[in-house]
Regions:
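Central cavity-lining transmembrane alpha-helices of secondary-active solute carriers
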Residues: 37, 57-82, 101-102, 166-169
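Juxtamembrane intracellular "pre-TM" segments in multi-pass secondary transporters
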Residues: 2-17, 220-261
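A single, central transmembrane helix in multi-pass transporters
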Residues: 247-282
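Cytoplasmic membrane-interface "Motif A"-like loop-to-helix N-cap segments
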Residues: 82-98
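C-terminal ends and interior cores of transmembrane alpha-helices
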Residues: 93-114
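Cytoplasmic helix-loop-helix junction between adjacent transmembrane helices
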Residues: 122, 126-160
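Glycine-rich segments within core transmembrane alpha-helices of 12-TM secondary carriers
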Residues: 154-180
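Short amphipathic helix-loop junctions that connect adjacent transmembrane helices
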Residues: 31-58, 275-282
Length: 282
């Protein structure tokens, strides 16, 4: 006779693995698109010969600032909106699908200055979509864990993200970038018109789509224990609720508010280093 407890434990383990796989796919895509490959491609190849006194790296910084501002405005209210568990799968599916579609569209960006603006728009939109998708993703942790297991499961997802980024970087480097001359990588793709980089973007998009799909398929089956305590809130209602909660916290413990602001600035600083490290190093 099957043991119901064992079956439930196996199902939970599968859901945790599916949850971690999404992080593996998302972090890998971010490493390729925003840090090491596409951003460098825009500044070192697409933007070469750009008329005017502003360098491609400066335009990249402005695009990143727009993406960061968008995330800063939308992420808190998205967090309020997805407090209802049934909304998390919808938000995660839409934002993940958007990031995949935008990354696929990067295949159209040739190494010509006329394509720089479109490339910057795609880069900023992908960065914003990918970052916002982490909001419903992180909210799902409460549906997968207890207070005693939250740290272990969260760490497993975090580690999976690093493994995914390193693994995809190796795949892209060995298959599409290594070597010199007019053809690169083990696939011997031509560098003319940036074809090797453009093909790499399709691989990065497929990486997120394949690794993110298991979570999207099981997300609607996650426990909805918090649904009753978090009634549905509209977008504008989310801003009102957010302001109410911040005001209440400010009156209760201002040090916590200071900490949240400082941690946000710290994370943004790290994100800027990650985004521009490869660009400045080329």
């Amino acid at each position: 006779m099957n043991n119901p407890g064992s079956r439930a434990g196996t199902l939970l383990h599968f859901r945790v693995v599916a949850w971690a796989m999404w992080d593996c796919g998302s972090t890998g895509l971010n490493a390729i698109v925003t840090t090491f490959v596409f951003s460098v491609y825009l500044t070192s190849a697409v933007g070469q010969g750009l008329p005017g006194g502003t360098s491609p790296a400066s335009w990249l910084g402005r695009a990143g600032a727009v993406a960061g501002l968008t995330i800063g405005v939308l992420a808190p209210v998205v967090g309020v909106w997805v407090e209802s568990p049934h909304r998390r799968r919808v938000a995660l599916s839409v934002l993940t699908g958007t990031a995949v579609a935008l990354t696929c569209a990067m295949f159209l960006i040739r190494d010509d200055p006329r394509y720089l603006w479109a490339g910057l728009v795609l880069l900023a939109a992908t960065a914003a979509s990918s970052d916002l998708s982490s909001v419903p993703y992180n909210a799902m942790l409460r549906q997968l864990s207890t207070p005693s297991t939250a740290g272990r499961i969260s760490g497993f997802g975090w580690a999976s993200g690093y493994v995914g980024s390193v693994a995809l970087l190796l795949v892209i480097y060995l298959g599409f970038m290594s070597g010199s001359g007019s053809q690169r990588g083990l696939l011997q793709l031509p560098v003319a018109n940036g074809l090797n980089v453009r093909m790499a973007m399709l691989v990065a998009a497929a990486w997120l789509a394949l690794l993110g799909l298991p979570l999207l398929l099981v997300a609607h089956r996650l426990p909805d224990s918090g649904a009753a305590s978090h009634p549905s809130t509209g977008l504008l209602g989310g801003y009102r609720k957010l302001w109410t909660e911040i005001s209440a916290e400010w009156r209760r413990d201002r040090n916590l508010v200071y900490f949240l602001v400082a941690s946000a600035i710290f994370r943004d600083g790290l994100a800027a280093i990650f985004a521009f490290g490869a660009v400045l190093g080329v």
